[in-house]
Each structure stands twice: as C-alpha cells, then as structure tokens.
C-alpha cells in the first residue's frame, strides 16, 4: 500500500499541475481596428455595355466598433470612383449594427453601379478601374480598394 501511495501521489500531482495551464485556444478573438477594413470579394460582370448593364461590387468589411452606416439618407458611407472621371459616386448604407452600441462587425456589402458610360462616345471599348472606400460614423476612412479592369463596350 505504501508503494501505491508513493507512485500514485506524484502522478496525480503532475496531472493536476499540467491541467492548470492556460488554454490559448479559448483566448478571445483579438479586437478589430475601429477604422474600417475592406477586401474585394468580387466584381461582376467584367464586361458591360454602356448605358445598359450594371456592375456589382461585393466587398467584405470589418469594423471594430461597428459604427458603419447612417440613419440619415443624405450621409454617405461608400465612395466609388471610376479612374476615367474625377467624379466620386457616393452610396448610402443603413446602420450595420444598432446605434449606440460598440460591437465588432464583419460582413459583405454589394454595391451596384447602374448604367456605366463611355467617356469617349467614338470609342469601341474602354477599360475602367474603380476605387472603393468606406467611411464610418466617426469619420474614419477605410483602406482603398482598386478593382480589376472592367471593359465597357458601346
């Protein structure tokens, strides 16, 4: 019986000590930045006819404090610029999390650009590249995405 205690007690002690190690897999997810971060998911189609087809840009967003979107329809969130023109196309987005909360959010946004035009009406085709950025309610601007070229046909 004494041998059993001598062998059993150290085994139990080692087991208890090793089970007290912090399990890093249960650590909370690191907090995302309060500045929005965006990634390009897709752009479709890659060829459009001027004044006929729409272009759909799908972007993934992450925002650490969840303040993307405005209740007021005249406050813009998404800014889309065609490299052929010095014009910014702004888009409104409703709040993506409840107002007054501070939660980390992530998701996808679809931005639809209707009726792309040709810069030169005599052109047989043009290549358009777009830049996209977001603005949150704290006036933080995201990184800027640059899309692959889209062919615009007459």
Locate each region found by the language model:
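Small/flexible residues
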Residues: 7, 23-24, 86
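First exposed extracellular module after export/assembly in secreted or surface-exposed proteins
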Residues: 31-154
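Sec-dependent bacterial lipoprotein signal peptides
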Residues: 1-20
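Bacterial Sec-dependent N-terminal signal peptides
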Residues: 14-38
